[in-house]
């Protein structure tokens, strides 16, 4: 991790202690192709003195070979690491960079601007707290600008910095900047992004990136780095306790523990817990980790929980606090971002994976898809690559989840093609649907027939057996 600090040279122990206590901000750079995302990240690192000498020497040499800025230093090469990216002068994969300043630690996700790589962008944005959306001052808002903004809103990113880049190419015009700002605010009226900041920059020349530019005296705001260091992110772990069971650990007849990672909230020894979906209640007897026994476990920790009661707990179950239960349903409404070249169609079976739980499921209704240009709802019967829709899902068995708006981890799932095992889509739960709607459709079949039907569809998908639960 790159970092500039005087403490490194004088007191390494104090530096490490201080570094460990810093807030971590995960952010993403997104926008249309050639808006300057990779160059901006390179400029942030360069002007913050966070590039090692050997890295700088390598970039100087590579700029002469494959650079796109003539005789100037091509800072985009710091993050465009794939050979195909350098040859084409574009970003294809999601590139992650880690650095810190005296105020914060940062993880940057640099994502592709090309439409065909929108799925990579959605992947990069899924864990971020903030998004920098770049707009080329010469081109204004593009289709990908709208698509990426909508995906950021969909994924629950609350803070967006709109960086109007390449201001040097339009003579640092305040009028052009204001026009783009007004157009984006009009778009933002249809999005759920509560905090939007604007800053005019030139990533190539460094204007308003780390230091305030003298070339735009009309801009009264702060440079980009100041916003990154000071924007208040809600880090409070106030989410309800959620512990998806990944593995049942039974090394001998005397021990039975349940292993996994705490995805939200916290729990301590003696807490009364409920196992979902069964609803059975027990008490935490001990919490074990790699470092030994813990009194309390928090989000992000990998632990083993033991209980006082011998109750049935399996992989895919969710352990929660007694009175903070999650939804349990086999029918739900969700937003889908489709990532496969093969379209999503109604009633086709896929694997639906919620954390440690995988079931078979299908779309039994397309509510609508979203037109990226207008953000209006459009009727549809299928979903193509990079399209976004709201659908109703039918699952082979009940699963535990929260709404994505409430919990970004337990409210998310992926859709897997059963024949190729390719991740075909990503989903965000809106809400569960009424359970009695499900029961009405299965009254004509016994439980054995339903289970046999599920087994046939799981192991012989090429038979195209009808889902009896629909």
UniProtKB/Swiss-Prot annotation:
Catalysed reaction equations from the record: sulfate + ATP + H(+) = adenosine 5'-phosphosulfate + diphosphate
E.C. code: 2.7.7.4
GO biological process, one term: sulfate assimilation
A GO MF label: guanosine tetraphosphate binding
Residues binding GTP: 31-38, 110-114, 165-168
Pathway assignment: Sulfur metabolism; hydrogen sulfide biosynthesis; sulfite from sulfate: step 1/3
InterPro entries (UniProt xref): CysN_GTP-bd (IPR041757), CysN_II (IPR044138), CysN_NoDQ_III (IPR044139), EFTu-like_2 (IPR004161), G_TR_CS (IPR031157), GTP-eEF1A_C (IPR054696), P-loop_NTPase (IPR027417), Small_GTP-bd (IPR005225)
Residue ranges, annotated region (G3): 110-113
Cited Pfam families: GTP-eEF1A_C (PF22594), GTP_EFTU (PF00009), GTP_EFTU_D2 (PF03144)
SUPFAM superfamilies referenced in this protein's UniProt entry, alphabetically: EF-Tu/eEF-1alpha/eIF2-gamma C-terminal domain (SSF50465), P-loop containing nucleoside triphosphate hydrolases (SSF52540), Translation proteins (SSF50447)
Similarity annotation: Belongs to the TRAFAC class translation factor GTPase superfamily. Classic translation factor GTPase family. CysN/NodQ subfamily.
Protein name listed in UniProt: Sulfate adenylyltransferase subunit 1
